């Protein structure tokens, strides 16, 4: 088994680290210090730097001005973004662009992808459904009529919706098919109601009331939504890995310097064992992430559907990240809750990611169903 990355993927990591080195996590707006949203907009200067270093066009094909790399490369960059709590819609924009590129029509690709790569167009995805506990594709209905589509329904917790130029909205048809509408944010029948996430970022409830969409702005290919949903989940696992890795490093540094009874507390067995267990969590998160990202990249069938590998990655990301952050707070003591220190920000972002990923028990149940359905003989 080869866990190495290609030269192009390693170059993407180096570029991402250079860009994200300018982000100070302890300066990220804190939900503990700000009532309501922590900021009206995402980090636009950082977004411009990502565009200037071609990281926004990383997965876009060369014919549209991009590098043409794969989901593994995207996840490598997202891991670096998670380390510093980067306040940019990098996952949503790149995942949506890759879905349009893979499943959209030529006119839609030509209109959106070059602008996305230049940082001029921001995309997001409505992936939480009506309540956050139901399939997103069931929250909105789509009906074709005279060459256009009519959308009705509600999606909650749409990240970066107020700043996005287009929102990709999954919807179900009367024929029990799932389609994706590439919805302009400003359009008759579209309304956004402000919501605030656990980390203080602006989310929105999206309401579609007889919204009319031209056929050219619809992605109707079978399997497109399922693929995009898995890519978003894998990207969130990459963000979780970056966050957990950084928190583990912070804990290691703190416990190595904090002394009690004349010795660094890292030398005490109770502390060392807890820290070691959390390191094992991050390693498991890493291995399962790259398995899922690799399956998405190659796209070839395996003994189980790609969704199974994504479910395993989500199980470890959701539970592992939570354990890492909770142990970090415990080992830091009162210092971990100090708002002048970055750890409480990581805790808030971890909770947001955990809620986005969903509970591990649900993924375990889904994985069990897949194993039963695909068991040999």
Put a short name on every predicted segment.
Residues 1-87, 369-377:
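Amphipathic, small/basic residue-rich leader segments at the start of a protein or domain
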Residues 2-8, 12-14, 82-83, 190-283, ...:
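Glycine-rich beta->alpha junctions and the first turn(s) of the following alpha-helix
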Residues 2, 13, 334-377:
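Glycine-rich phosphate/cofactor-binding loops in nucleotide/flavin-utilizing enzymes
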Residues 87-107:
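N-terminal glycine-rich flavin-associated loop
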């Amino acid at each position: 088994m080869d866990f190495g990355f290609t030269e192009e993927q390693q170059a993407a990591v180096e570029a991402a680290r250079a860009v994200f080195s300018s982000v100070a996590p302890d300066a990220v707006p804190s939900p503990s210090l700000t009532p309501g949203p922590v900021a009206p907009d995402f980090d636009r200067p950082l977004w411009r730097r990502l565009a200037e270093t071609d990281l926004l066009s990383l997965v876009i094909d060369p014919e549209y001005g991009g590098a043409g790399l794969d989901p593994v490369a995207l996840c490598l960059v997202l891991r670096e973004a998670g380390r510093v709590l980067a306040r940019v819609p990098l996952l949503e924009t790149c995942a949506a662009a890759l879905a349009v590129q893979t499943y959209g029509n030529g006119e839609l690709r030509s209109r959106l992808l070059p602008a996305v790569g230049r940082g001029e167009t921001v995309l997001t995805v409505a992936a939480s459904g009506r309540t956050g506990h139901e399939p997103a594709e069931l929250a909105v209905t789509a009906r074709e009529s005279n060459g256009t589509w009519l959308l009705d329904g509600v999606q909650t917790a749409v990240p970066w919706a107020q700043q996005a130029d287009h929102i990709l909205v999954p919807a179900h048809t009367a024929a029990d098919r799932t389609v994706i509408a590439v919805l302009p944010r400003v359009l008759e029948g579209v309304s956004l109601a402000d919501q605030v996430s656990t980390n203080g970022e602006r989310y929105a409830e999206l309401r579609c009331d007889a919204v009319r969409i031209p056929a050219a702005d619809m992605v109707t290919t079978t399997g497109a939504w399922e693929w995009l949903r898995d890519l978003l989940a894998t990207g969130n696992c990459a963000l979780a890995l970056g966050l957990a890795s950084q928190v583990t490093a912070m804990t290691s540094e703190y416990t190595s310097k904090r002394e009690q009874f004349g010795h660094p507390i890292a030398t005490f067995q109770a502390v060392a064992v807890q820290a070691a267990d959390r390191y094992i969590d991050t390693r498991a998160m890493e291995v399962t992430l790259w398995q899922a990202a690799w399956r998405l990249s190659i796209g070839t069938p395996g003994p189980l559907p790609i969704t199974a590998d994504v479910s395993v990655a989500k199980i470890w990301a959701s539970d592992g990240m939570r354990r890492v952050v909770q142990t970090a707070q415990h080992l830091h003591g009162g210092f971990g809750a100090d708002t002048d220190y970055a750890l409480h920000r990581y805790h808030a972002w971890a909770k947001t990611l955990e809620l986005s990923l969903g509970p591990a028990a649900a993924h375990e149940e889904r994985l069990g169903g897949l194993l039963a359905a695909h068991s040999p003989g």
